[in-house]
Design a protein with these regions (language model features):
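Glycine-rich phosphate-binding P-loop
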Residues: 1
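P-loop NTPase motor domains
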Residues: 9-14, 18, 23-202
Length: 202
C-alpha cells in the first residue's frame, strides 16, 4: 500500500515505485554479484563463479533475458554475442575502472536493440557467422517490447535512483503486471541491491 513512501521522502530517501516508470535501473550497467568468484564452486550460480565484474554481469544478463522471455539457448548465446559487441563499442572491457563510471557512461537497452537491428539488416549469409539471420529476427521480436515498446518504460534508460542510502521499492503495482515483466523487474532489483551491499554496504 506504499505506506513507507511519506516517511522515505521525508528523510530524503528515494521511493521507487517500480511500475510508475519514473525510476529505472539500467540492466546493462554492470552490477557486482560476488566479491571473489570461484570457478570451482559448482554449487554457486554461474554469475557467482566468474572472476571479473563484466563476466559476472554478462552471465547475469543471460538469466535476466531468460526471465523476461522464453528464449532458447541459441537465442541467449546470440544475445550474449551482441551484448559483448555493444560493450566493446562503448569501450567497456574487463579492464574498465567501473568505480569511475557514471550511469550515463553505459549503453541502454535501446542501444542493444539498435545494434542487433543493424546486424540483422547487414546480415551476410556468406560470412559464416555463429548466428543466423532468423535468430537475429527472433531476438529482435522477443526484445522489442522491453527495448522500444510497452515495457521499455520499466527497463530502457540510465539508472536514476536518487539515493541508495535510504531506498524503498514500491512493488504493489507489480501484483497485476505480466509474469515475465514482474520476474525481470525483481531480478533487476535484486542485482541492484546485491551491488550496493557489496560495494557500498549498509
Amino acid at each position: 500500500e506504499h505506506e513507507q513512501q511519506e516517511m522515505c521522502e521525508a528523510v530524503g530517501g528515494c521511493f521507487a515505485d517500480l511500475m510508475a516508470g519514473k525510476y529505472i535501473i539500467n540492466v546493462l550497467e554492470p552490477k557486482c554479484w560476488d566479491d571473489g568468484g570461484d570457478p570451482d564452486d559448482t554449487a554457486a550460480p554461474e554469475a557467482f563463479r566468474k572472476s571479473t565484474l563484466l563476466a559476472q554481469h554478462v552471465s547475469f544478463l543471460k538469466d535476466f533475458f531468460r526471465a523476461y522471455k522464453d528464449f532458447s539457448d541459441a537465442h541467449i548465446d546470440t544475445i550474449e554475442i551482441m551484448v559483448s559487441k555493444l560493450y566493446a563499442q562503448w569501450g567497456i572491457t574487463e579492464r574498465t575502472n567501473f568505480r569511475r563510471m557514471r550511469p550515463e557512461d553505459y549503453p541502454i537497452l535501446s542501444d542493444l536493440y539498435d545494434l542487433i537491428e543493424e546486424e540483422f539488416k547487414r546480415y551476410d549469409p556468406n560470412a559464416h557467422l555463429l548466428y543466423t539471420e532468423k535468430l537475429l529476427q527472433e531476438v529482435l521480436l522477443g526484445l522489442h517490447s522491453m527495448c522500444k515498446g510497452a515495457d521499455a518504460q520499466f527497463f530502457n534508460g540510465h539508472t536514476n535512483i536518487t539515493s541508495s542510502r535510504f531506498l524503498v521499492f514500491g512493488v504493489k503495482g507489480m501484483l497485476s503486471a505480466a509474469k515475465n515483466v514482474r520476474n525481470a523487474m525483481l531480478f533487476n532489483v535484486l542485482s541492484f541491491m546485491s551491488d550496493k551491499l557489496l560495494t557500498v554496504g549498509n
